[in-house]
C-alpha cells in the first residue's frame, strides 16, 4: 500500500476481543497496528451490542462524515447500545485473559468436532478464531440438521448458497470465553449425534 500511496483499511468485525494482545484485534495479532490508516468493526460480535465504529485520522473521519451515503443517511445508535459496547470493552480491558481462554476453547472444540467425525473446513482447523464451520454440503440437509440441533438446545447458524459455493453448505458454530469444556462436550455430542443420523 505504501508503495502506491494507498491507505490501509482493516475491517475487523471478527478480530476485536478475539485476536491480538488482550483481544486488540487483527492488526495487533499480525504486529501491524502502526500501519493501519482506517480501522473499523462492529459492536455486534464480541461487544454484545449493535452498531459499529471507525477509527482514522481527522482528515479521513471528516471525509466519511460528509461523503459516505450510508453514514449520512443513518441514525446514531441508541445510548443503551453504546453503553453496552463500552462496558464490554472495559471488561475486556480488565480481563485480558479472556481472549486466550476463548482461543483455548476454540482449539478444544475443533479437536472435539473432528474426533466426533465431523468435517471442518481445512482452513479453519488451525485458525485462532471462535467460529468453526462444519460442512453439511447439501442445503436442505443443512436446514434439517440445524433445526434438529436447535430443538435439542444448541444453536448453530446454517450457512447456505449464495453465502457458500453450491454443494458446500455448512453449520457455523461460534464459541464464547464463558463456555466450559463440559458445555462444549454436551453441545458437540448433540451435533455429532444429529449429523450421524442425517
Which residue ranges define each predicted feature?
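Catalytic PLP-binding core of fold-type I/II PLP enzymes
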Residues: 1-22
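PLP-dependent enzyme catalytic core of the Aspartate aminotransferase-like
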Residues: 151-154, 163-198
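Active-site core of PLP-dependent enzymes with the aminotransferase class I/II
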Residues: 1-4, 140-142, 182
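Short hydrophobic/aromatic beta-strand micro-patches
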Residues: 55, 133-137, 174-176
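Active-site PLP attachment segment
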Residues: 28-63
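Conserved PLP-dependent catalytic core of the aminotransferase class-I/II
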Residues: 79, 86-121, 128, 132-155
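A short glycine-threonine-serine/GTX helix/turn-capping micro-motif
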Residues: 68-77
Amino acid at each position: 500500500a505504501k508503495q502506491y500511496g494507498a491507505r490501509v483499511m482493516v475491517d475487523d468485525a471478527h478480530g476485536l476481543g478475539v485476536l491480538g494482545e488482550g483481544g486488540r484485534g487483527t492488526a495487533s495479532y499480525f504486529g501491524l497496528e502502526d500501519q493501519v490508516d482506517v480501522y473499523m468493526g462492529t459492536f455486534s460480535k464480541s461487544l454484545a451490542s449493535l452498531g459499529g465504529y471507525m477509527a482514522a485520522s481527522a482528515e479521513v473521519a471528516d471525509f466519511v462524515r460528509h461523503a459516505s451515503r450510508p453514514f449520512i443517511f443513518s441514525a446514531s445508535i441508541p445510548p443503551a447500545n453504546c453503553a453496552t459496547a463500552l462496558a464490554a470493552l472495559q471488561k475486556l480491558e480488565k480481563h485480558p485473559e479472556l481472549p486466550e481462554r476463548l482461543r483455548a476453547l476454540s482449539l478444544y472444540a475443533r479437536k472435539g468436532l473432528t474426533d466426533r467425525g465431523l468435517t471442518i473446513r481445512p482452513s479453519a482447523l488451525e485458525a485462532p478464531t471462535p467460529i468453526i464451520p462444519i460442512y453439511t454440503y447439501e442445503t436442505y440437509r443443512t436446514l434439517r440438521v440445524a433445526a434438529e440441533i436447535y430443538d435439542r438446545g444448541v444453536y448453530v447458524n446454517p450457512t447456505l448458497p449464495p453465502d457458500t459455493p453450491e454443494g458446500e453448505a455448512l453449520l457455523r458454530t461460534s464459541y464464547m470465553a464463558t463456555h466450559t469444556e463440559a458445555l462444549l462436550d454436551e453441545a458437540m455430542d448433540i451435533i455429532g449425534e444429529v449429523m450421524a443420523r442425517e
